[in-house]
């Protein structure tokens, strides 16, 4: 597989959320607003990139019987570092994300790429695979955060977009359903349906 394909495929035919249906829980939990969705996206991307790189570098020295334990130790260490950076520089977002940053440790995307790719590939392709899957995940999270905050709260990144456009004065009201977790699940379902309708080879 070419290096470019490692970044390109997770955006379309091998998207971790739309095709593999991994990492859906965070889609429901952190996408009510755009800012936490972006921060979570960056956090997961950094963790999956670095964990892929580290495990790939160590792949020939890890005993098969304890590989999952080693992977969890590496991912846990990276997640703790990311969490501390967020608390130091983005404390408000860190509080908003709460336990969900810690739950990156159990994110199926991270563990899936370590098992399926990093354990059998060289460091550079593993790093690119982590980047591609992180970005593929990020596109969906940021899209959901954009739509849900705009139509649910009338804001984007806290800026009152709908108010500035004067839509409230003509009777527009925020859709409270948009900021509820079930709506995120519905939106993910709609995106998956649209994606598979455009890619017939993905249909079972």
Predicted feature locations:
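Structural signature of hydrophobic alpha-helical transmembrane segments
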Residues: 34-50, 70, 94-105
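Hydrophobic core segments of alpha-helical transmembrane domains in multi-pass membrane transport
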Residues: 24-28, 44-49, 76-83, 105-109, ...
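Short amphipathic alpha-helical coupling elements at transmembrane boundaries
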Residues: 6-9, 56-60, 125-133
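Transmembrane alpha-helix boundary signature
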Residues: 81-96
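Short, membrane-exposed interhelical loops at transmembrane-helix boundaries
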Residues: 157-177
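C-terminal ends of transmembrane helices
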Residues: 51-64, 111-121, 194-196
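Cytoplasmic-side transmembrane-helix entry/capping segments in multi-pass membrane proteins
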Residues: 62-75, 96-102, 129
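N-terminal membrane topogenic signal
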Residues: 7-18
């Amino acid at each position: 597989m070419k290096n470019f394909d490692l970044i390109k495929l997770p955006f379309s035919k091998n998207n971790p959320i739309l095709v593999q249906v991994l990492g859906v829980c965070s889609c429901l939990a952190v996408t009510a607003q755009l800012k936490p969705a972006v921060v979570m996206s960056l956090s997961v991307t950094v963790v999956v990139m670095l964990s892929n790189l580290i495990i790939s570098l160590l792949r020939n020295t890890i005993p098969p019987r304890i590989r999952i334990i080693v992977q969890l130790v590496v991912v846990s260490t990276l997640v703790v570092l990311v969490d501390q950076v967020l608390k130091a520089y983005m404390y408000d977002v860190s509080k908003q994300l709460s336990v969900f940053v810690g739950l990156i440790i159990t994110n199926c995307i991270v563990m899936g790429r370590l098992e399926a790719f990093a354990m059998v590939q060289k460091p550079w392709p593993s790093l690119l695979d982590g980047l591609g899957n992180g970005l593929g995940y990020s596109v969906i999270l940021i899209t959901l955060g954009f739509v849900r905050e705009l139509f649910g709260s009338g804001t984007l990144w806290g800026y009152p977009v709908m108010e500035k456009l004067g839509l409230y004065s003509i009777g527009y009201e925020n859709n409270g359903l948009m900021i509820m977790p079930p709506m995120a699940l519905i939106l993910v379902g709609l995106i998956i349906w649209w994606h598979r309708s455009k890619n017939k080879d993905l249909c079972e």
